[in-house]
Design a protein with these regions (language model features):
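Short extracytoplasmic
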Residues: 47-74
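Secreted/periplasmic serine-hydrolase-like ester/acetyl group-modifying domain
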Residues: 131, 140, 144-252, 344-384
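Small-residue-rich helix-loop
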Residues: 274-275, 279
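Membrane-embedded segments
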Residues: 69, 75-163
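Hydrophobic membrane-insertion alpha-helices, especially the h-region
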Residues: 12-33
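C-terminal regions of proteins
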Residues: 282-384
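Alpha-helical transmembrane signal-anchor/signal-peptide segments
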Residues: 32-54
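Active-site segments of SGNH/GDSL-like serine hydrolases
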Residues: 249-273
Length: 384
């Protein structure tokens, strides 16, 4: 009988210690809230710098968009995250807005975040969706931090709640949040409050303050090597269907939907050519236009051919453009101060003008290549 009581007491003590330990961990992580999903008030010098949000983009954005009653949204990949500002004056009557683009997303993920937004944000009136070639690659699978269960609801998914309060990664992120908040209290982190990425933090933390040419080289090599980018490519019918679902739902809901192809730098389009995917690139555009008119900012125009030198006005590297260029994109799409936009930047593609436009890009490419053999060789040298 005595042994039985001893075991019982031991078990109760163990449960109590475990419960207290877990409560302390949960309280610690809840206070520092490294992914900004709990909503803990911030205290300067302790928990206000949320740089760890970068490792839980899909989680924090799914939660953040629920808090603002958005009237306008941006969707797409990290190109949209960097380039489009929700406070653009052309959207002044559609505030608040939120940049719901997700890093490295495929078209299915983008569609599901669209579904999430319209399920929880009944006031959404306008959506601007950026489309990228790699988003439609059959090899581009859902990222590990994508979870269906967190979408379509305003409530925090139980699995996510465990992840942010009791997991080891969250504890490490909380410690880093304390360190970052204490050592650099005025640092905005990787994201602004409206979901747009901070290019300065990315250049510092991801590219380690390397110059623009090393950044171009790093990104282009990555695109040429990775099979889910340009390493291999097969246009996904399923992803085209996902886009069509977004178009159809927007029409049914009375949401103004603008589609556009990102204005990455000319060297990014050279990488597609070097990868042997130019015909697939054009086939992708044909497939898009078959679904809806779409603004095309790609190609070798007066903006995408900006000279490569430190510093660059419009580009972080070959793939990502800055807000300064994104403002011109929005000027064109929203017909806001159109006189500020170069005439060759942003063409609305329809079945009527598509083939002529594709031919013009080929001619522009030949002229650019003749004038820039150094950069043609630069990209060709990166081919694996």
């Amino acid at each position: 009988m005595s042994n039985h009581k001893d075991y019982r007491c031991y078990g109760l003590r163990l449960l109590t210690v475990t419960a207290v330990f877990l409560a302390l961990i949960a309280g610690f992580n809840g206070f520092f809230d490294p992914y900004q999903v709990i909503g803990t008030p911030t205290i300067k010098g302790l928990n206000q710098v949320k740089r760890e949000k970068d490792i839980q983009v899909r989680l924090f954005k799914a939660v953040a968009v629920n808090k603002i009653e958005a009237k306008s949204l941006f969707l797409g990949s990290s190109r949209t995250e960097f380039g489009l500002d929700t406070h653009h004056p052309g959207l002044s009557d559609l505030q608040p807005g939120y940049n719901l683009a997700i890093t490295g997303g495929n078209m299915y993920e983008v569609r599901r975040y669209f579904d999430h937004a319209i399920a929880t944000q009944p006031e959404v009136k306008e959506i601007i969706l950026s489309l990228d070639f790699f988003m439609f690659n059959q090899a581009k699978k859902n990222t590990p931090d994508f979870r269906e269960e967190r979408l379509g609801t305003r409530n925090l998914f139980v699995g996510d709640l465990f992840e942010v309060l009791l997991s080891k990664p969250a504890f490490i992120s909380s410690l880093r949040t304390l360190k970052n908040s204490f050592s650099r209290p005025n640092n905005p982190g990787f994201f602004y409050e409206d979901g747009r990425r901070n290019p300065d933090s990315t250049i510092e933390q991801v590219y380690f303050n390397q110059g623009v040419i090393p950044r171009f080289r790093m990104v282009l090599r990555d695109f040429l090597v990775r099979p889910d980018l340009y390493g291999t490519y097969q246009l996904s019918v399923d992803y085209l269907n996902d886009l069509n679902a977004v178009i159809t739902t927007s029409q049914q809901r009375g949401i103004r939907l603008h589609l556009f192809i990102s204005p990455s730098h000319a060297l990014q389009w050279e990488a597609i050519r070097v990868a042997g995917l130019w015909s697939e690139f054009e086939a992708w555009k044909r497939a898009l236009v078959n679904l809806s008119p779409i603004w095309d900012f790609s190609g070798y125009n007066s903006m995408t051919t900006e000279a490569i030198a430190d510093p660059m006005q419009y580009y972080i590297e070959s793939s990502h453009y800055r807000k300064e260029l994104g403002d011109l994109v929005l000027n064109r799409i929203l017909d806001y101060r159109p006189e500020t936009v170069p005439s060759d930047f942003g063409i609305l593609l329809t079945p009527t003008n598509l083939e002529t436009h594709l031919e013009q890009i080929r001619r522009d490419r030949e002229l650019w290549a003749q004038e820039n053999p150094k950069w043609v060789e630069f990209v060709e040298a990166l081919k694996p």
